[in-house]
Amino acid sequence: MPRGLELLIAQTILQGFDAQYGRFLEVTSGAQQRFEQADWHAVQQAMKNRIHLYDHHVGLVVEQLRCITNGQSTDAAFLLRVKEHYTRLLPDYPRFEIAESFFNSVYCRLFDHRSLTPERLFIFSSQPERRFRTIPRPLAKDFHPDHGWESLLMRVISDLPLRLRWQNKSRDIHYIVRHLTETLGTDNLAESHLQVANELFYRNKAAWLVGKLITPSGTLPFLLPIHQTDDGELFIDTCLTTTAEASIVFGFARSYFMVYAPLPAALVEWLREILPGKTTAELYMAIGCQKHAKTESYREYLVYLQGCNEQFIEAPGIRGMVMLVFTLPGFDRVFKVIKDRFAPQKEMSAAHVRACYQLVKEHDRVGRMADTQEFENFVLEKRHISPALMALLLQEAAEKITDLGEQIVIRHLYIERRMVPLNIWLEQVEGQQLRDAIEEYGNAIRQLAAANIFPGDMLFKNFGVTRHGRVVFYDYDEICYMTEVNFRDIPLPRYPEDELASEPWYSVSPGDVFPEEFRHWLCADPRIGPLFEEMHADLFRADYWRALQNRIREGHVEDVYAYRRRQRFSVRFV
């Protein structure tokens, strides 16, 4: 390779990232117009398009580099010099952290995810930690209640860029003040003030005002979801002011926000104060920088691994028929490997399973499907793997494992947030907790279905319970669109003997689903059956599912709320 080519390659990669993030911001900047026009299908399509941008631009850069190098092989010293030149370009670069991830992605695409060493990649950042502790330009505006909170909130709402008419601005402000007074008390509220992000956070059918409620005793989240009536008038649906509520709004089971963030590291740093339980990876994920979130997630894993003496073990719960799942006992994530061979009743391919996981990545997850990060050629030290898990890996996924002596390489896996399997949770709880779990499970099914997702396998073992008590679906190998399913009633038996026969007396085609059968496995436990019949009996009727299908086919997009119905102002104060 001729000398001097290293700088050209480094500049080409950074220019490629500039192009990618420019398109990312362009798609994001259209969120306000899509919201104001109530073009919910365009909202969904923009979300998919934005997710695809990253890989598309990585591919473009890879093709450019192959042209620049004429396809010649590169030696280790050349690659090190490329990284050195790239690193020198970053100190004054505003999106340095994601630029490093983009470099990693280009390298992995060129070299098939091999030789992933700190010398060649940005395994950890080259820049000072939390470089944007001091924000280089204001991300938020302060509002003080000099003339009372009604006046303050009127200024906040009047400053919003939204161009639609408000249904009843004074009413909404009254509800917010009432909530704040009940939460803080009159004296504390009088001594508090607001800091509000300059940009709205758009997701699904809502525009979120995100702020900080700065009180004498500390800083709280201040979140206002703004919705539209059927007549296109704006209203504020609730006010959320606890870290637990904010954590759910920014949760790992939800779609990414569309928020205009030319300085993503600064925005993440600003959000950290009101989302103290979120990792850096989760914060980047929430604002749509999912590829850099993957980088941060891997860094968090490495830091945890360096500081513990644990070994990987098989994850608790019923062993899956498609996935082998393992974890570190104290780590909050699980690792999922597609098995070489599936159980006989699972008539599908590994490619189908991967397609299902990609569907979930791109779809509106409505707070009920866990996000995943996908890795190739994932290296594990053998000393970190328990003997039982090593035997299981070799038994179930040997075709995906390469033995390097002291290490193994797993060709492909997913990393996902760890939860308590719902079947285990139901065994451990009783009373109100049991009732809440069954209510949550049914609500999860309903919300997935309304978003055009049919889970396929609805057994409790395929769902998990989060630290906030929410029920989330995490087993995607049988997932499909609601509109692809044929929901049928079981025909009446022709003769009494039909009900005793080992085979059904009616024909069953691929795609046929009989909701009446759900009762057999969801209500078998005498503690659970009555609760299910009380709260979710309609899930056992085919006409319920067909009615949902009709709404989806008619183009209806359901509202998705990241909070309980009882928290809505229309329920709470009316």
Curated annotation (Swiss-Prot):
InterPro entries attached to this UniProt entry: AceK_kinase (IPR046855), AceK_regulatory (IPR046854), Isocitrate_DH_AceK (IPR010452)
Active site per database record: D371
Catalyzed reaction equations: L-seryl-[isocitrate dehydrogenase] + ATP = O-phospho-L-seryl-[isocitrate dehydrogenase] + ADP + H(+)
Segments passing through the bilayer: none
Alphabetically ordered keywords of this record: ATP-binding, Cytoplasm, Glyoxylate bypass, Hydrolase, Kinase, Nucleotide-binding, Protein phosphatase, Serine/threonine-protein kinase, Transferase, Tricarboxylic acid cycle
Keyword Metal-binding in annotation: no
A Gene Ontology cellular-component term: cytoplasm
Binding-site residues for ATP, renumbered to this chain: A315, P316, G317, I318, R319, G320, M321, K336
GO MF term (any one): protein serine/threonine kinase activity
Main location: cytoplasm
E.C. designation(s): 2.7.11.5, 3.1.3.-
Subcellular location(s) of the protein: Cytoplasm
GO biological process: glucose metabolic process; glyoxylate cycle; tricarboxylic acid cycle
Family as reported in the entry's similarity comment: Belongs to the AceK family.
HAMAP family: AceK (MF_00747)
Function comment: Bifunctional enzyme which can phosphorylate or dephosphorylate isocitrate dehydrogenase (IDH) on a specific serine residue. This is a regulatory mechanism which enables bacteria to bypass the Krebs cycle via the glyoxylate shunt in response to the source of carbon. When bacteria are grown on glucose, IDH is fully active and unphosphorylated, but when grown on acetate or ethanol, the activity of IDH declines drastically concomitant with its phosphorylation.
Entry-linked PANTHER family: ISOCITRATE DEHYDROGENASE KINASE_PHOSPHATASE, PTHR39559
The protein's name in its UniProt record: Isocitrate dehydrogenase kinase/phosphatase
Species of provenance: Escherichia coli O127:H6 (strain E2348/69 / EPEC)
